[in-house]
Design a protein with these regions (language model features):
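Short cysteine/histidine-rich zinc-coordinating motifs and their immediately flanking basic loops
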Residues: 58-65
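C-terminal capping alpha-helices of c-type cytochrome domains
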Residues: 90-120
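The canonical Cys-X-X-Cys-His
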Residues: 42-54, 104, 108
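Extracytoplasmic/secreted proteins, especially bacterial periplasmic and envelope-associated proteins
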Residues: 28-32, 76, 80, 99-106
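Electrostatic cytochrome c docking/interface patches
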Residues: 19-41, 89-90
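Bacterial N-terminal signal peptides
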Residues: 8-17
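Short Fe-S-cluster ligation motifs
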Residues: 74-95
């Protein structure tokens, strides 16, 4: 179990570093995570509303190959983010290869790592 945790931690750190190298900005991702207007959202909710302290995230979140969100199978973490933007925030999906998505993914790596012990 320790080995798996260490590998997942290393993967998260690596993923965050790759994001930074590719121009992703975790600080900008944090701002996006906290604003209710992401994707033109109209519900008044932000990502943080549902995921405060990493709720519903684990170290495995970043590396999963398949996700199940509200009973719906989703193939990528970017797809999960867009699902939440469309359903919870009542906005429009953002480009999966766009700067906002890269910034959010970079921030999520850090956010999940920092909150992995609090989300249980």
């Amino acid at each position: 179990m320790k080995t798996i945790t260490m590998l997942l931690t290393a993967f998260c750190i690596f993923f965050a570093a790759i994001g930074i190298c590719l121009g992703a900005d975790a600080q900008q991702g944090k701002l996006l995570f906290e604003i209710p207007t992401l994707g033109g959202g109209t519900s008044g909710k932000s990502c943080l509303t549902c995921h405060e302290h990493g709720r519903d995230f684990s170290l495995k979140t970043i590396s999963k190959k398949q996700y199940l969100v509200m009973g719906n199978p989703v193939g990528t973490l970017a797809g999960v983010i867009n699902f939440c933007i469309e359903v919870a925030l009542r906005g429009e999906a953002i480009a999966e290869n766009g700067q906002e998505m890269h910034d959010l993914l970079a921030y999520l790596s850090v956010f999940i790592q920092n909150n992995s012990d609090k989300s249980q």
